[in-house]
């Protein structure tokens, strides 16, 4: 069911100050702050301070993203955590898709600072199962063919069932191949960190996700040592924060944060 609130009009990062419980919201690969603002606004209404960040190389141009490493994306997320701490007493990190990988790294490396995790459509593995095998070849392709294969255009837009949201989302129209290499490296790095993540975790994923298969849920249930609660959506695709179930997602996240990150039940 579509949300009762209008979709965001701004693509800027924003700190929405409210109560002393806080949420850091981290968007996905080739995404932008817009995809997390709707959730941030709903959390703010629930008296939760929300910091919607923009990752390095995102929300500007594909060329900007091309020169950025995954460590730079993590640096953006870490800076967002630092900023949010100035206004809150406890923090839950909410990451979508690739942002979920960064959230896992934040939790593993900052256990005293991150109270809990919400992973929206996490991208530990993607529907393009051969990508990890192909990624090491990408630098050779770029050297051999130059600009011809520098960017890969997205076909059909973002993986969103809601037509209005799919039309409105201002994500990149093409993906830099160099950035794909960085994504694969981040996936491997995040997978190695899973045994270190002991915070309560809420995983929200759609059974209709065409980008990151529902298999991601099973991986997290098996490999995270801390408590994990899952919610499987039926009407949304990949970008669940703005898709047909966006109000349900917002309510579940707000409840999780307000409970202090309790995942059991």
Segments (PLM) and residue ranges:
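Gly/Ala-rich beta-loop-alpha elbow adjacent to hydrolase catalytic centers
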Residues: 95-99, 103
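Catalytic active-site module of serine/aspartate enzymes centered on a nucleophile-bearing elbow/loop
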Residues: 234-265
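Active-site nucleophile elbow and catalytic-triad environment of alpha/beta-hydrolase enzymes
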Residues: 176-193
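Conserved alpha/beta-hydrolase
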Residues: 43-62
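Conserved alpha/beta-hydrolase "acid-adjacent" motif
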Residues: 210-216
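Short beta-strand/loop motif that positions the catalytic acidic residue
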Residues: 197, 203-205, 209
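Active-site nucleophile loop of the alpha/beta-hydrolase fold
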Residues: 118-127
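Catalytic histidine neighborhood in serine/cysteine hydrolases
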Residues: 218, 222-239
């Amino acid at each position: 069911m579509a949300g009762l609130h209008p979709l965001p009009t701004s693509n800027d990062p924003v700190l929405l100050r409210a109560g002393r419980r806080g949420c850091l919201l981290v968007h996905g690969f080739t995404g932008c702050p817009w995809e997390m603002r709707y959730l941030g606004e709903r959390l703010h209404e629930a008296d939760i301070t929300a910091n919607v960040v923009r990752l390095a190389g995102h929300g500007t141009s594909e060329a900007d993203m091309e020169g950025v490493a995954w460590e730079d994306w993590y640096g953006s997320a870490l800076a967002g955590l630092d900023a949010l701490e100035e206004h809150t007493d406890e923090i839950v990190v909410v990451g979508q898709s690739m942002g979920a990988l960064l959230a896992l790294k934040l939790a593993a490396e900052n256990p005293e600072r991150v109270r809990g995790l919400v992973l929206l459509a996490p991208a530990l593995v993607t529907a393009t199962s051969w990508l990890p095998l192909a990624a090491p070849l990408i630098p050779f392709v770029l050297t051999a063919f130059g600009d011809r294969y520098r960017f890969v255009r997205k076909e059909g837009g973002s993986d969103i069932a809601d037509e209005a949201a799919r039309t409105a989302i201002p994500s990149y129209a093409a993906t830099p191949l160099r950035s794909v290499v960085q994504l694969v490296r981040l996936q491997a790095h995040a997978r190695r960190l899973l045994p270190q993540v002991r915070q309560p975790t809420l995983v929200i994923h759609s059974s209709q996700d065409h980008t990151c298969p529902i298999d991601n849920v099973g991986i997290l249930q098996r490999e995270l040592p801390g408590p994990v609660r899952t919610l499987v959506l039926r009407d949304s695709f990949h970008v669940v924060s703005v898709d047909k179930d966006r109000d349900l997602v917002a309510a579940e996240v707000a409840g999780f944060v307000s409970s202090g990150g309790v995942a059991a039940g």
